[in-house]
């Protein structure tokens, strides 16, 4: 698992380069002001946008639970070399719960900065963990801090460009969606040094369903009285729950 001298790595590199080039040649995309106009605007118990706020609580619970379980170092489904990456993932969940909850109290570009920073911490940590169990633990452990920096930098860059009146989401889009392209490729072309790969496959599927729910925010709200965006929070939290269960039951492959 420690070597990446394999022709299949070229597919990952080529995919990364192609997507980066595509993003580079796409005109800058600013944040749509309508993005903040979510379907469920209800104020309940004095809390504005109640369900979009409180559906972030599972992220807090799962993040705190996972953080302390990882610190005990009693879980079988973790790679010892990646202790910091697991901690970063679960801390990212905690920050996502806080950042998203705060954002939904009064949605704005400024509040969205913290939300997106937290999400990038979770995304980059998850990507590093999958890279490590699939390709190279040594290389992945070296990637954690640079990728976290790039993720946070993408949000800072977007915020600066928005403040300058020339909003540019391209860098952030690359950071968010490139891992979602590369992870399935790693699952398809590489094995794992941990058992139970189906846990990761389930997490990817759940993430896709969550994004679909987000896309149909208004339609789902009109259909069931509960918005697609709030449902997205719960579905994504279920994905985090699957990850936590995975690190409890997966085992190293000798």
Task: Name each region found by the language model.
Residues 2-147, 153-165, 189, 194-253:
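Early transmembrane hairpin module of multi-pass membrane proteins
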